[in-house]
Amino acid sequence: MEFGLSWVFLVAILKGVQCEVQLVESGGGLIQPGGSLRLSCAASGFTVSSNYMSWVRQAPGKGLEWVSVIYSCGSTYYADSVKGRFTISRDNSKNTLYLQMNSLRAEDTAVYYCAR
């Protein structure tokens, strides 16, 4: 009975959060060391340029690691591990956030997430 109640409660929570804000990432792939890749994060339900937006990543078996942030004013900051190799940007007309990743290393292997 407890399981059934928990499940109904979870459904109720999820139903209340339906697609007000959505972030859809794309652009991942398998790349050789030294290669480049650009990640995209298309936003809906809010304006990317009016918020600060971040990229974070999670390497296999590890916790979340902050990668980069872009503020509404356009200022950008990077983790030391990616500085000089990664570039965060946004296209206000497409309401999309980007992460250009160059000179990729084995240690950059991770699942990447955009976040508001």
Swiss-Prot record:
Zinc keyword on record: no
Keywords assigned by UniProt, alphabetized: Adaptive immunity, Cell membrane, Disulfide bond, Immunity, Immunoglobulin, Immunoglobulin domain, Membrane, Secreted, Signal
CDD domains: IgV_H
GO cellular component, one term: immunoglobulin complex
Signal peptide: 1-19
GO annotation (BP), single: immunoglobulin mediated immune response
Protein name: Immunoglobulin heavy variable 3-66
Source organism (scientific name): Homo sapiens
